[in-house]
From Swiss-Prot:
Amino-acid positions noted as binding Zn(2+) 1 in the UniProt annotation, renumbered to this chain: C5, C10, C24, H64
Domain of life: Eukaryota
Sites of Phosphothreonine modification: T47
Binding site for Zn(2+) 2: H27, C42, C43, C59
This protein's encoding gene: CHORDC1
Chain positions found as N-acetylalanine: A2
UniProt name for this protein: Cysteine and histidine-rich domain-containing protein 1
Keyword Chaperone among UniProt keywords: yes
Organism: Bos taurus (Bovine)
Sites bearing Phosphoserine, chain numbering: S51
Domain CHORD: 5-64, 157-216
Binding site for Zn(2+) 3: C157, C162, C176, H216
Keywords, ordered alphabetically: Acetylation, Chaperone, Metal-binding, Phosphoprotein, Repeat, Stress response, Zinc
Region described as Disordered: spans on this chain: 62-82
Length: 332
């Protein structure tokens, strides 16, 4: 029976009887994410593309490992006896205070409202970085391996969550099981936007089986600019919600962020030839006129002013049950 290898960067299935000391190629280090760059602590290679990060070949040989790494242990909280707790409680007189009347919730506007371009604020660091790139771009041109139509043996599939490698023409006929969404890292949790199976352990996240079937993508042949995923997260205060997209050297003249009260469409062009797209059906209602975008050399921050001061349960509004059923019927 084939077992799944849990060594970082491997994810292959293996036969325990044929397992040898050099059967597995893996990363002994840990994943490192810094300023939109992704890599392994044991290797020097860095990339901004998450699918390229997943396809970085391991730097160490060893035996396959079938033992699943344990989930992070939560600290045990010990409580004292009820008597001791009651003695520690401060003694005071009760005063009943009438709570203020709740603020009437704003009625959710129609998603068909016209979209408005959010104001772009460009930082000095981004202006300096773009000026340097313009000076150097006229002297250097790098040829990439992806420009070639030839697929080399051992090339990793570029689909998210797929760990298969190209072994010859027969690989073109294989069914690819992958994640059609993008990776999301938020408040210590890691998951794919397409299936939302959340985990706090990075190895478990990498080992999650895909939720979509299709054909392997051995090369990226996007004409012109390439649409790529970007690491992004969000946070909120009482009056604002902020989305951070970690894309370096974004181009203000080619980028656009539009929104209405309940929808947000993000289109960012960065590093000359890469594009990031994201459409968000917002959980709450925003004030478009008081919302704006700040573009720096390392990231883009979308600051949205809340129409009412309330805590958002999530960034995106969950799909209605009728919409989910329609999606399931179309996928089947």
């Amino acid at each position: 029976m084939a077992l799944l290898c849990y060594n970082r960067g491997c994810g292959q299935r293996f036969d325990p009887e044929t397992n040898s000391d050099d059967a597995c190629t893996y990363h002994p280090g840990v994943p490192v994410f810094h300023d939109a760059l992704k890599g392994w602590s044991c290797c020097k290679r860095r990339t901004t593309d998450f699918s390229d990060f997943l396809s970085i070949v391991g730097c160490t040989k060893g035996r396959h490992n079938s033992e699943k790494p344990p989930e992070p242990v939560k600290p045990e909280v010990k409580t004292t006896e009820k008597k001791e707790l009651s003695e520690l409680k401060p003694k005071f007189q009760e005063h009943i205070i009438q709570a203020p009347k709740p603020v009437e919730a704003i009625k959710r506007p129609s998603p068909d409202e016209p979209m408005t371009n959010l104001e772009l604020k460009i930082s000095a660091s981004l202006k300096q970085a773009l000026d340097k790139l313009k000076l150097s771009s006229g002297n250097e041109e790098n040829k990439k391996e992806e420009d070639s139509d030839e697929i080399k043996i051992g090339t990793s599939c570029k689909n998210g969550g797929c760990s298969k490698t190209y072994q010859g023409p027969q690989s073109l006929e294989e069914v690819c099981v992958y994640h059609s969404g993008v990776p999301i890292f938020h408040e210590g949790m890691k998951y794919w936007s397409c299936c939302r199976r959340k985990t706090s352990d990075f190895n478990t996240f990498l080992a999650q089986e895909g939720c979509t079937t299709g054909k392997h993508m051995w090369t990226k042949k996007d004409a012109g600019k390439k649409v790529v995923p970007c690491r992004h997260d969000w946070h909120q205060t009482g009056g604002e919600v902020t989305i951070s997209v970690y894309a370096k050297n974004s181009l203000p003249e080619l980028s656009q962020v539009v929104a209405n009260s309940t929808l947000l469409n993000v289109h960012i062009v960065f590093e000359g030839e890469k594009e990031f797209h994201q459409n968000v059906k917002l959980w709450g209602v925003i004030d478009v006129k008081r919302s704006y975008v700040t573009m720096t050399a390392t990231k883009i921050e979308i600051t949205m002013r809340k129409a009412e001061p309330m805590q958002w349960a999530s960034l995106e509004l969950p799909a209605a049950k009728t919409e989910e059923k329609q999606k399931e019927e179309t996928t089947e």
